[in-house]
A protein has these predicted regions:
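Conserved PLP-enzyme active-site core in the AAT-like
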Residues: 93-316
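Long amphipathic N-terminal alpha/beta scaffold segment
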Residues: 37-75, 104
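Conserved C-terminal alpha-helix-loop-beta "cap" of PLP-dependent enzymes
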Residues: 341-419
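Structural motif of enzymes handling amino- and sulfur-group chemistry
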Residues: 288, 296-297, 304-351, 358-361, ...
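Long amphipathic alpha-helical segments
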Residues: 1-48
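Glycine-rich phosphate-binding segment of PLP-dependent enzymes
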Residues: 26-27, 31, 61-62, 71-93
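A short linear hydrophobic-aromatic micro-motif
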Residues: 54-55, 116, 398-403
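Short Gly/Ser/Thr- and Asp/Glu-enriched loop/turn motifs at secondary-structure junctions
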Residues: 4, 59-63, 274-278, 374, ...
Length: 431
């Protein structure tokens, strides 16, 4: 028998974890460890580890705006989570269409016949292809070899296609794919669909050739097929807004609206990347296909919650009202170098840290614009024990996620909201 009881072990730390969790941990530990001191050490480590990894707000000082490990696009959550008219028509006092206003708003923004919303963009592609396979008798997917992608979390395009029951047909080469390649593949596989995938997280340069959505749309018109464009990133912002803020890094980034105009039947993208909203997948395009997807038996298993729909509604309204500056993602991206530099100087104040301010490169992140960066002033802090300071940053309330650059701690305010500056200043004053 162990020389320490479950209750004694639970009471050996002042962790604020629920007692039920601590009791479960204690029982597991005491089932294999009999020595009281060893059991206490193990219990302290496990409870501390579990407690520090509760989901909480952090300060992102990495300079990666769409930080995948920190939730991608930040959102200003205004929804209370209380009852909402998600499927209730207030004009008639009876059951209504789900997210009717959001649907009309998004259709207007994207200039699309119809739209559907799911939990992420991987679901968008999976459901679309599965629907075309089951309801339209399409049996294969034609994709350029240069677009057979893998994204974070081991998501591989061939695996998704295989899961739908369709066959992957590769055309062209890694660096060169021509219209003729698609044309010949369609002749051999008349029940195939055309899929174009945006290479958002990598680029191919040099001796290259690609086929545009317009050219594929022309090819589609002469064949009984569909053209699907998996855009992933989801750029919808007005070019006037980009010009106003002198932002040029999106010049070659395809826009959702343009893809639809150029003839894609279905375009899909992530809600939490360049769209700047909450995690979701948005499917836009031909109303007949969208309706088939919505009426598909498993669509319900991928649909969005009230909170997600509310945040998408709010973001869509901001675009329609030309209030892009109010979208947190865009508010960070458009910050001017000199303004960020002034904020750093204010944070540092008159303190005698060993620091310097240098020009660094911020990135968009989230698997988008792999070759593009933004010049930003960086606060480099030189400390004696860098590991100790990093540990303090992570245990701070709120935690501050910084980078290590050339043996120094790096703070990039490009991804920090101005109302968080005081927390960084407070931390620096404490070390």
């Amino acid at each position: 028998m162990p020389n320490i009881s479950v209750n004694e072990l639970v009471d050996s730390t002042n962790s604020d974890l629920p007692r039920e969790i601590k009791t479960s941990l204690a029982k597991n530990i005491l089932s294999s460890i009999k020595d009281p001191l060893e059991a206490k050490e193990k219990f302290f480590t496990l409870t501390n580890n579990l407690n520090i990894n509760k989901q909480r707000e952090v300060i992102n000082a990495t300079g990666t705006i769409l930080h995948t490990n920190l939730g991608r696009a930040p959102v200003d959550m205004s929804y209370s989570g209380m009852y909402a008219n998600i499927e209730y028509d207030l004009s008639t006092g009876s059951r209504g269409d789900r997210n009717k206003y959001l649907t009309e708003s998004m259709k207007t923004l994207l200039e699309a016949e119809s739209v559907a919303f799911v939990n992420n963009n991987a679901s968008s592609l999976y459901l679309t292809l599965l629907c075309l396979f089951r309801k339209y008798n399409k049996d294969s997917v034609i994709v350029s070899r240069g677009e057979i992608i893998e994204i974070g979390g081991s998501y591989r395009l061939p695996d998704i296609i295989s899961e739908t029951g369709m066959k992957l047909i590769e055309v062209g080469t890694t660096n060169k794919t021509r219209k003729k390649d698609y044309e010949e593949a369609l002749k051999v596989n008349p029940n195939a669909v055309l899929l174009k995938v945006h290479r958002s997280n990598y680029s191919i340069s040099g001796f290259t050739e690609d086929v545009s959505i317009k050219d594929l749309a022309d090819l589609k018109e002469n064949n009984d097929t569909f053209l699907i464009h998996d855009l992933g990133s989801g750029l919808v912002v007005d070019t006037v807004f980009l010009a106003k803020h002198n932002i040029s890094i999106f010049e070659k980034e395809p826009k959702v609206q343009q893809s639809l105009k150029d003839g894609a039947d279905i375009v899909m993208f992530s809600g939490d990347k360049l769209f700047g909203s909450i995690q979701s997948g948005i499917i836009a395009g031909k109303s007949s296909i969208i309706l088939s997807i919505k009426n598909f038996s498993i669509f319900r298993t991928y649909r969005c919650s009230a909170i997600v729909l509310h945040e998408l509604q709010k973001t869509t309204e901001m675009y329609l009202k030309k209030s892009e500056e109010s979208i947190p993602f865009w508010s960070l991206l458009i910050k001017q170098y000199k303004d960020l530099e002034q904020r750093i100087k204010k944070i540092v104040g008159d303190n005698n840290y060993d620091y310097e301010i240098v020009t660094g490169k911020s990135v968009i992140g989230g698997g988008t614009l792999p070759n593009s960066t933004l010049d930003s002033p960086i606060l480099l802090l030189n400390v004696n024990d860098i590991n100790q300071i990093v540990e303090k940053l992570l245990k701070n309330t709120p935690p501050i996620i910084a980078r290590i650059t050339d043996g120094k701690i790096s703070f990039d305010l490009r991804s920090v909201f101005e109302n968080q500056d005081g927390e960084i200043a407070k931390f620096l004053n404490s070390i």
